[in-house]
């Protein structure tokens, strides 16, 4: 419990306080191994990072290593995209963060990167905080840098959106770009479809177009992975057998002047008695 909005001074470090990432690995999508990593402990030069978040995983074919790319900023400076390499066991960072992409305008942040390889090109979709936040694309011949800026907006949203992610339709040369429309209530996802990463068709939002939600609402910062039929069946069978019930509780923190139910207090100070007097309203029920 703390009395300040953030753990560190907001003017100096901005919102958030996340200095690392959680790495998790599984062979069956049920049992997971976890490792915590801290960027600020890798070197003294990273001790003053403001926040690190929105990680994604890719494989760098040129160096033969798993690569994590993510959003990070130093202190309360603008946000940029960085990458690191991790070991084969996926429990330890093996390199210092390197710059993956920064917005050409030095006053604008770039966050929430998502990379898709098509042919010999790497397509980086990201959020540009250039006016109203939205989705832009940059393309490179290599996964770890040299992305060429494209000024075009690739979302169809009149509202702010973030967290782009791309997946390929099975059996088709079509890709779907999904993004989080966080600026509406309740939150929703919106979708576009492309076959060439130049022209995009607007598919609308969940339940407002061809995409339908099932057992969820108000989704947030999502991602999509392909499953085989066997994998999907195993997951369904496991969770039908191992249903979980979550019960949340909240601690009640009070600092009452006196017990009972009172409201609308007025406090007066008496010069004659040199005491303070409280005059509240009451429901008439003691205790």
Question: Where is each model-derived feature located?
Answer:
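Carbohydrate-active catalytic/glycan-binding domains of CAZyme proteins
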Residues: 1-287
């Amino acid at each position: 419990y703390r009395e300040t909005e953030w753990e560190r001074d907001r003017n100096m470090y901005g919102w958030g306080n996340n200095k690392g990432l959680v790495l998790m690995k599984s062979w069956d999508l049920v049992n997971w191994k976890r490792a915590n990593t801290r960027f600020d402990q890798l070197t003294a030069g990273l001790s003053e990072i403001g926040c690190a978040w929105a990680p994604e995983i890719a494989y760098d074919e040129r160096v033969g290593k798993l690569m994590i790319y993510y959003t990070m900023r130093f202190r309360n400076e603008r946000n940029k995209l960085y990458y690191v390499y991790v070991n084969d066991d996926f429990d330890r960072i093996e390199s210092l963060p390197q710059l993956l992409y920064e917005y050409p305008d030095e006053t604008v942040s770039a966050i929430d990167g998502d990379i898709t390889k098509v042919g010999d090109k790497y397509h980086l979709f990201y959020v540009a905080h250039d006016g109203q936040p939205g989705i832009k694309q940059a393309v490179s011949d290599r996964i770890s840098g040299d992305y060429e800026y494209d000024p075009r907006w690739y979302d169809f949203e009149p509202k702010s959106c973030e967290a782009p992610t791309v997946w390929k339709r099975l059996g088709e040369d079509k890709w779907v770009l999904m993004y989080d429309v966080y600026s509406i209530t309740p939150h929703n996802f919106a979708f576009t479809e492309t076959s060439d990463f130049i022209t995009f068709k607007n598919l609308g939002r969940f339940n407002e177009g061809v995409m339908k939600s099932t057992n969820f609402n108000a989704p947030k910062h999502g991602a999509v992975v392909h499953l085989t039929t066997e994998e999907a069946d195993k997951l369904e069978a496991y969770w039908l057998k191992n249903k979980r019930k979550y019960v949340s509780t909240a601690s009640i923190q009070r600092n009452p002047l006196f017990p009972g139910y009172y409201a609308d207090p007025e406090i007066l100070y008496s010069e004659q008695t040199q005491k303070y007097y409280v005059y509240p309203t009451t429901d008439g029920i003691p205790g």
